[in-house]
Amino acid sequence: MSNNIPQNTVEVSSVYTYKELSIDKLKYEYEITVGSDYIKQKVNSRLQEIAENAKSPGFRAGKMPYDLVVANYKNEALEYVINNTIDYCSSDLMKKIEVKSHIYPKVDVISLPDLGKENEEGNFVYKLSFESMPEVPVIDLDKINLKKIEAKIEEEDIKEFIDSIKTKFPNFASVDDASYQAKDGDKLIIDFEGRIRNKLFQGGSSKNFAVNLGSGTFINGFEDQLTGMKKGETKNFKLKFPENYQAISLAGQEADFSVRVNEIQIAKDFENDDEIAKSIGFKDYSLLINHAKKMIGDQCTEMRNLLIKKELFDYLDANYSFDLPTDIVKQEQQRMEGELGAQNDSRKEAEKRVKLAMLFMKFSAEHKISLTQNDVLSVIVNQYVSKDVQFDRVLKHFESNKQFQELVRGQALEYKVTDYIIEKVSKEEQIVSVKELKELFDNI
């Protein structure tokens, strides 16, 4: 090994020496030096291995002159040796300084030996930077007391729910008055045709089509043209499709429309409760009441669960403190900003998420909580599958993308550990009204 070793270093082995550059909480930086003699020896050994099978025009495999092997493969051999040397020295150093686990090691090459010269200045020197994993405390269940909020469903809550159904599914009746002019909120049964340069375009015509004025079903301006029309009336008008219209062939195009109003229906009050129920598919009003109670109950359960989870998360964030790996926090912050857009407090929220994830990982290990296939599939189905994104597509992405796998597994572990903790800790029941529960939820 070369005698030209930097001062203030610690001799570790016959292969390398190291010098501590900085230690800041979880961050470590070291300068590692490997003598040129060692590198040359390893490069020569690698070249001899290559020579055994090297091929070149005019020479059989393994018969290439050694000087040609050196000329053709020296850089490849050096790269191979440098990579192996970095792996060995970095791993060995971490064992020596007793770093049990680390995150995202970074290597910066400072100097490489010049294999073409015989000198003592050609040591291989690189800087190793990494973060160690922090010592994470175990969550103490005995110290946690949460509020278990229960909402009492009253008659007024059921009435409000059914009133919302009336608004969504109004009771329409035909207008016989030939002089009646259609207005917002009315339902019109129409025939229409749309033409561009005198040609019908795809999807531009229909018979007995129902349109609610004010609903925005058609392109901007279409329903405005129908306002004021009478039953049996026909109207011709021009409209321009928006430049960003989803059908590219129609975007920005001017169209000629012809519309005939076949029928006008206006909303009217239901005659009795059973009529309300039947209008949306229930046999009688009592079944609608039961449906309303269930729907309100389900909504309250969802809000209650989110509230108690937030209370738990806030408690853990406030009562457990330890150093966080800055690289992981930075990655989480970038992921959040990519999904949600720039946030003023994204750094703080990223730190909270990383802290909770580490607390949950530690807790799951201590309490032997492991994920099942169903846990992972549940997250995929509930979080990522939608009418626009099919299950098979998400599953394929999960199987092929390691980063997405880690994200989904992390979410699944969070849900499982959170449910476990909430079940085990002390809880104080609090009865509130449905309105009060909604206010608490809206203030999250």
Curated annotation (Swiss-Prot):
Disulfide bonds: none annotated. It is an enzyme of class 5 (isomerase). It catalyses: [protein]-peptidylproline (omega=180) = [protein]-peptidylproline (omega=0). InterPro entries: PPIase_dom_sf, PPIase_FKBP_dom, Trig_fac, Trigger_fac_C, Trigger_fac_C_sf, Trigger_fac_ribosome-bd_bac, Trigger_fac_ribosome-bd_sf, Trigger_fact/SurA_dom_sf. It comes from the Bacteria. Keywords: Cell cycle, Cell division, Chaperone, Cytoplasm, Isomerase, Rotamase. One of its GO terms (cellular component) is cytoplasm. One of its GO terms (biological process) is protein transport. It is found in: Cytoplasm. Involved in protein export. Acts as a chaperone by maintaining the newly synthesized protein in an open conformation. Functions as a peptidyl-prolyl cis-trans isomerase. Consists of 3 domains; the N-terminus binds the ribosome, the middle domain has PPIase activity, while the C-terminus has intrinsic chaperone activity on its own. Belongs to the FKBP-type PPIase family. Tig subfamily. This is Trigger factor.
